[in-house]
Amino acid sequence: MRNYKMVVFDCDGTLVDSAIMIAMLYEGYRKMYPNRSFLPYEHFIPCYFQSDQENCAYLQIPKEDKERFEDICFHQLEFGMSSVKPFSGINEVLIEIRKLGYEVGIATSRSYEAFYGIREQLSKEVFDCFSCIGVQDVVHYMKPAPDVLLYIMEQTGLPKEQLLFVGDSMNDARCAKAAGVDFVWAKWGSIGTEVFPCMYAAEKPEELLFLL
């Protein structure tokens, strides 16, 4: 078994089941731009894996509309962010990883503001497990570029061999490969049929404990 010192998690689709956000963007877009050409639900699926800036460019949301668009999508709709919940077992696994003496980190394409929003979904005990948080605000290039993992290595002083990155998307897998970090495919959060290159594949969060 490798000598890991830190387990780094992606956020959406790995810690929290936020697939509902696809529907939020779909409905919010229709509400904000009723006169634009219709876009099918499938068009919004890539938004699940992209940053806020990438989504605005992808959906052609002008900069001056961004704040209102996000408010409509994530706060005004009936199924708001309160619908986003941690995956079953993830809270217990995070706490157990810390008890075993490993550091726990975050590598997400969310902004600081958006990431800290998951405090509403995670308990204080779980949120306090994170000793290093990498978000879009601290890097030049987001996943699949390796920047966010390189940032975590820089902040912690840990070499790539001592990090294990857990994620649910091809962007996560490519980020890990580019950084030279072992990757665990969090299959519990996958929303499609695509197969990702990985060192390990885990069907449930609890399986992570057997990799440490």
What label would you give each PLM region?
Residues 24, 30, 43, 61, ...:
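Flexible domain-boundary/linker segments
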Residues 38, 46, 67, 84, ...:
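Non-catalytic, surface-exposed connector residues within folded enzymatic/regulatory domains
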